[in-house]
From Swiss-Prot:
Its cofactor is Mg(2+). The lineage of its organism: Archaea, Methanobacteriati, Thermoplasmatota, Thermoplasmata, Thermoplasmatales. This is Geranylgeranylglyceryl phosphate synthase. It comes from Picrophilus torridus (strain ATCC 700027 / DSM 9790 / JCM 10055 / NBRC 100828 / KAW 2/3). CDD domains: PcrB_like. Keywords: Cytoplasm, Lipid biosynthesis, Lipid metabolism, Magnesium, Metal-binding, Phospholipid biosynthesis, Phospholipid metabolism, Transferase. The keyword NAD does not apply. GO terms for molecular function: magnesium ion binding; phosphoglycerol geranylgeranyltransferase activity. Belongs to the GGGP/HepGP synthase family. Group II subfamily. Mg(2+) binds at D22, S51. Prenyltransferase that catalyzes the transfer of the geranylgeranyl moiety of geranylgeranyl diphosphate (GGPP) to the C3 hydroxyl of sn-glycerol-1-phosphate (G1P). This reaction is the first ether-bond-formation step in the biosynthesis of archaeal membrane lipids.
Length: 243
């Protein structure tokens, strides 16, 4: 079964939680331990990426460490073309649709298309939308930030993504964001869009996760919390049980 089909099958039964591990935020062995704790807590998939300062060697070693500790499928969340590894189960073939820089919309994707085909890694087409405050990813990605409660603009982007044939749409507030995407934005998108909606950024506790899931988010992503928590299992288990 492909990773994407696995996602769709799981969504028929429940909401999904994904743990984002940034290889640049801790040593390789710690990445493996985080993944192990996340699996015990009930996370469904491991995303690897986030930073732009990651090369393919670090990705290879990090994914290897994660796979040695967990049976969960791994998905690359690329911040640059250098973050491709054949060891992952899949990669988000993502377009930062509200960027001012064409490289983030389609340029990097064109440059890596042949390489990805040669690797025979599963690609999952995904629209990536960055909302205020955006944090580092908004700055680096040169995003025209969508206001966190601007449901009309968000809906138009999401509809365009679905019309393009994207299989997922990711609503991002930015790693370490003090706020998360408004529930009203998610509700509006879910009224019209049939592809799964991922929400990440600013989700620090079960209350936030519960609200976003109730609003219609299909997939909840948490990353900063696993980097900062002394007990990854407890921190994630509380969030995962709430969705």
């Amino acid at each position: 079964m492909t990773v994407y089909n696995d996602i769709i099958e799981k969504l028929k039964r429940k909401k999904i939680h994904m743990t984002l591990i940034d290889p640049a935020s801790q040593d390789i062995e710690s990445s493996g331990r985080i993944a192990e704790a996340a699996e015990r807590a009930g996370t469904d998939f491991i995303m690897i990426g986030g930073s732009t300062r990651i090369n393919s060697e670090l990705m290879d070693k990090t994914i290897g460490a994660i796979k040695s500790k967990t049976s969960l499928k791994t998905i690359i969340f690329p911040g640059s073309p250098e973050m491709i590894s054949p060891r992952a189960d899949a990669i988000y073939y993502m377009s930062l649709m509200n960027s001012r820089n064409i490289d983030f919309i389609i340029g990097h994707q064109v440059k890596t298309s042949l390489f990805l085909r040669q690797l025979a890694i599963e690609t999952i087409p995904m629209a990536y939308l960055i909302f205020e405050p955006g944090m580092t990813v908004g700055r680096v990605g040169e995003a025209n930030l969508i206001k966190r409660d601007d449901s009309d603009t968000a809906l138009l982007y999401a509809l365009a993504a679905e019309t393009f044939g994207m299989k997922l749409v990711y609503l991002e507030s930015g790693s370490g964001s003090p706020t998360y995407v408004s529930e009203n934005v998610i509700k509006k998108i879910k009224e019209y869009v049939k592809i799964p909606v991922i929400v990440g950024g600013g989700i620090r506790d079960k209350n936030a996760a519960e609200k976003l899931a109730a609003a219609g988010a299909d997939i909840i992503v948490t990353g900063t919390i696993v980097e900062r928590s002394r007990n990854v299992y407890e921190a994630l288990q509380e969030i995962i049980s709430s969705i």
